[in-house]
Amino acid sequence: MGTIDYSPRGKAVARLKEGLEALRREPENTLYRDGVIQRFEFTYGLCSSMLERCLMHAAPIQPDRKMTFPALIRTASDLGLLHSGWDVWHGFREARNLTSHVYKEEIARQVVEKIPAFAEEAEFLYAELEKTSA
């Protein structure tokens, strides 16, 4: 697995955590909140593609036999790349799907509540992938 460069994903995780820290200091700042939600969106997307790429590299999947997202998460969890399994990641996925509705205050709050746990998962995933590529 040594040929995959995961550093852009690590930068995305760092930026997400930076946004969370700013929001923690000013929890009513909607600009920070919206920025954290946007950083969550792109970090979530990068984590998903990173997992797929990693697993395809480790055990090539035929293009016509692409893993479903739940199977991808379960496999990555079984391999120790994730702290949590599908039950937790399903919640992250639901939050990601809600991000198109963040103009609704209650939905924005629901999404933001899940982001700190996601950031920890993303950081763990990045660290595990860095270990495997070393």
Regions found by a protein language model. Name each.
Residues 1-134:
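Solvent-exposed interaction patches of small proteins and small membrane subunits
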